[in-house]
């Protein structure tokens, strides 16, 4: 072989596999193509149906979740409110009984029982009173209403509680309003 023959490309050798060469005619079978088309359309319809079902399920889930959240918000206090009804009933009965009563001690006893009942309901639902009398002032749990000089107490000690604070499951619901000690002037 000469050099020229080696460099001449062979058209049949360079054609990719499965490619149609100039002399060969492609196979054309309409029945096979029609069957492939029908299978592809059936598969596409199946995927479309699945997508529609999934979309409908997601929409239903979204609606159900929104309804559940709304109901949870609406009825979150249902048990607490139900327990408070007994306290309200007790207060109403006490007021009715006090209308003709002149014995203040009986009225006081009834009020104390009602307060005890309320405290039990609050405790049952995680509401805890904060009475920081004598404790160090904590700005996260106390609200200082005033400061008073006091030589007997360390500065920043709660001297008096004007209004108790409350926690709900260890989270501050309302800070205690307090009077805080400070060092006397001149010290």
Swiss-Prot record:
InterPro entries with a match to the protein in the record: GrpE, GrpE_coiled_coil, GrpE_head
Highest taxon in the source lineage: Bacteria
BP terms from Gene Ontology: protein folding
Transmembrane segments: none
UniProt key word Chaperone: yes
Keywords: Chaperone, Cytoplasm, Stress response
Family matches, as Pfam families: GrpE
Span list, region Disordered: 1-27
Biased composition (Low complexity): 1-17
Coiled-coil features, chain-numbered ranges: none
A cellular-component GO term for this protein: cytosol
Subcellular location: Cytoplasm
A single MF term (Gene Ontology): unfolded protein binding
SUPFAM superfamilies per UniProt: Coiled-coil domain of nucleotide exchange factor GrpE, Head domain of nucleotide exchange factor GrpE
UniProt-listed PROSITE patterns: GRPE
Family stated for the protein in its record: Belongs to the GrpE family.
Protein role: Participates actively in the response to hyperosmotic and heat shock by preventing the aggregation of stress-denatured proteins, in association with DnaK and GrpE. It is the nucleotide exchange factor for DnaK and may function as a thermosensor. Unfolded proteins bind initially to DnaJ; upon interaction with the DnaJ-bound protein, DnaK hydrolyzes its bound ATP, resulting in the formation of a stable complex. GrpE releases ADP from DnaK; ATP binding to DnaK triggers the release of the substrate protein, thus completing the reaction cycle.
Assembly and binders: Homodimer.
HAMAP family: GrpE (MF_01151)
Protein name: Protein GrpE
Gene assigned in the entry: grpE
């Amino acid at each position: 072989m000469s050099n020229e023959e080696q460099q001449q490309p062979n058209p049949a050798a360079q054609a990719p596999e499965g490619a149609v060469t100039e002399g060969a005619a492609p196979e054309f079978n309409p029945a096979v193509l029609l069957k492939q088309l029908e299978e592809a359309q059936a598969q596409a319809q199946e995927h479309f149906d699945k997508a529609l079902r999934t979309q409908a399920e997601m929409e239903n889930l979204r609606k159900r979740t929104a309804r559940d959240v709304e109901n949870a918000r609406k009825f979150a206090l249902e048990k607490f409110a139900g327990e408070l009804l007994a306290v309200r009933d007790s207060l109403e009965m006490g007021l009715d009984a006090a209308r003709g009563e002149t014995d203040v001690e009986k009225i006081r006893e009834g009020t104390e029982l009602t307060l005890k009942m309320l405290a039990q309901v609050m405790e049952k639902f995680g509401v805890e009173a904060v009475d920081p009398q004598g404790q160090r002032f904590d700005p996260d749990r106390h609200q200082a209403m005033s400061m008073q000089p006091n030589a007997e107490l360390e500065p920043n000690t709660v001297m008096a509680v004007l209004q108790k604070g409350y926690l709900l499951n260890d989270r501050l619901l309302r800070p205690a309003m307090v009077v805080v000690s400070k060092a006397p002037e001149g010290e």
